[in-house]
Regions:
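Non-cytosolic head/periplasmic domains of membrane-anchored proteins
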Residues: 106-195
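Sequence-level detector for tyrosine residue identity
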Residues: 38, 45, 53, 67, ...
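Generic structural motif
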Residues: 66, 144-148, 200
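Surface-exposed beta-strand edges and flanking loops
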Residues: 8, 54-56, 68-71, 79-85, ...
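C-terminal, structured domain-capping segment
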Residues: 99-127, 180-243
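Short, polar/proline-rich extracytoplasmic segments that appear immediately after membrane translocation
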Residues: 2-97, 106, 229-243
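Phenylalanine-focused residue identity feature
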Residues: 22, 31-33, 43, 50, ...
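Feature for long, exposed domains in two main contexts
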Residues: 13-32, 40-41, 126-130, 174-187, ...
């Protein structure tokens, strides 16, 4: 199983003003984390890939499909994206404001992973589906400084683990649901022909108080899945026998 690894570089200087934690080596002040991020999906552990996968409840019509670009709509159970071998600590303020509109598929930056894909109801009936992002494995509490930004169409939500000191959500974020679940949303009444556009962004927040030397050498695994629900037909009303 491939995992995200957190390492330290003593030869690069963090130049952004809002990174305030530094490590002094000689006359150089440095604070940098390097990350090898991975996401697993679809029963297969893929090294150096970020993947989204699709599930259906048993014995249902497969109405929901996922694809990377509108020019290549093919039914798939999973999508794979490129990742970066190294990812330095970042800040939410550094991220481009147009991440959810700039490109389809992989469009990573120097210090974040970004992947855009589409979910469409392409078949013949209105459905409900669930979207989840789940933490598979954590070593050295790397999730304490993790940020996951989810764009669904034009709606943006930033997810983070609650503060370990106050138990409250970090500023400007929505708290993870629990230790394993970053987010879980149920999309209802998803009509035939309707499309949801997702952009997922993953980075390590350098301004988080938990972003310390203790994370160095840690690992994390995260995956996302979409699950189409079985459609339950309403029962026909029965005439009551009054005799």
């Amino acid at each position: 199983m491939s995992k995200t690894k957190i390492n330290k570089s003593a030869k690069e200087t963090v130049k952004k003003k809002n990174i305030k934690r530094f490590l002094k080596i000689g006359s150089i002040v440095v604070f940098l984390f390097l990350v090898n991020l991975y996401v697993i999906l679809s029963f297969v552990y893929q090294e150096k890939s970020f993947t989204v996968y699709l599930e259906h409840e048993d014995r249902i019509e497969k109405n929901l499909m996922i694809y990377e670009t509108k020019d290549d709509k093919r039914y798939r159970y999973h999508l794979k994206a490129d990742i970066l071998d190294e990812l330095s600590a970042a800040s939410l303020a550094w991220l481009p404001e147009n991440l959810h509109t700039e490109a389809d598929g992989s469009h990573n930056g120097n210090n974040y992973i970004a992947y855009t894909f589409y979910a469409e109801n392409w078949w013949k009936e209105t459905i409900n589906y669930n979207a989840q992002i789940i933490i598979d494995d954590v070593i050295r509490n790397v999730d304490e400084a993790l940020r996951v930004v989810v764009y669904r169409n034009d709606e943006k939500v930033v997810y983070a683990k609650p503060s370990s000191t106050t138990g409250e959500p970090e500023e400007g974020t929505k708290a993870f649901i629990d230790e394993k679940t970053i987010m879980a949303e149920r999309i209802e009444n998803f009509e035939v022909g309707q499309v949801d556009k997702y952009t997922i962004v993953i980075f390590i927040e350098g301004d988080d108080a938990e972003c310390t030397d203790a994370l160095i050498g840690g690992e994390i695994g995260v995956y996302m899945k979409l699950t189409e629900e079985k459609t339950v037909e309403p029962e026909e009303p029965q005439d009551e026998d009054i005799n």
